[in-house]
């Protein structure tokens, strides 16, 4: 193998790694009180009304993050963390039916009562697992970094008393894009 080709491939691999794990400083916009910002970079894939496990109506917002999106996860609003659980698992292609149950995932509940956002991060084909630096009862500030996920799907569950401020197909940036408000 030619040394120039090997040097080129090494440089390309280095650039890809630096790009995938970049951690840009973000200026957190000052939205009105009770605002909810995006937890991950990506594209809004779906917004629907669902019935949650408590039998209450909620909004379900799905964000798909790819390899080219920033992988840093950010806090949706200033609050206390109610739950934080990381479930280790596989990193299979999302087209495989079992991937939904077997892939690594992280469940976090931000806030309590009527001001609560449930977040589920599911990893898809990735060489790096989900990193979560939160634990229960942590006090967190809107836009603060709390973890890392390269190539995955993030589901946000908002209470039905919230107002959603995004549309399907919209590109969102963690900590900067307004997802909605608590009413």
Regions found by a protein language model. Give the residues of each.
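Contiguous, well-folded functional domains in the mature portion of proteins
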Residues: 1-183
């Amino acid at each position: 193998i030619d040394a120039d080709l090997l040097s080129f491939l090494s440089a390309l691999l280095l650039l890809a790694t630096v790009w995938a794990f970049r951690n840009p400083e973000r200026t957190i916009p000052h939205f009105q009180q009770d605002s909810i910002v995006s937890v991950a970079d990506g594209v809004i894939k779906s917004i629907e009304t669902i019935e949650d496990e408590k039998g209450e109506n909620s909004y379900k917002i799905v964000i798909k993050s790819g390899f080219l999106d920033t992988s840093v996860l950010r806090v949706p609003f200033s609050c206390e963390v109610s739950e934080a659980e990381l479930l280790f698992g596989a990193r299979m292609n999302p087209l495989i039916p079992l991937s939904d149950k077997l892939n690594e995932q992280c469940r976090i509940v931000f806030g309590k009562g009527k001001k609560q956002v449930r977040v589920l991060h599911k990893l898809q084909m990735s060489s790096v697992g989900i990193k979560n630096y939160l634990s229960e009862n942590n006090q967190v500030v809107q836009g603060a970094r709390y973890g890392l996920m390269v190539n995955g799907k993030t589901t946000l569950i908002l209470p039905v008393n919230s107002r959603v401020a995004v549309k399907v197909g919209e590109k969102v940036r963690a900590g900067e894009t307004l997802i909605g408000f608590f009413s």
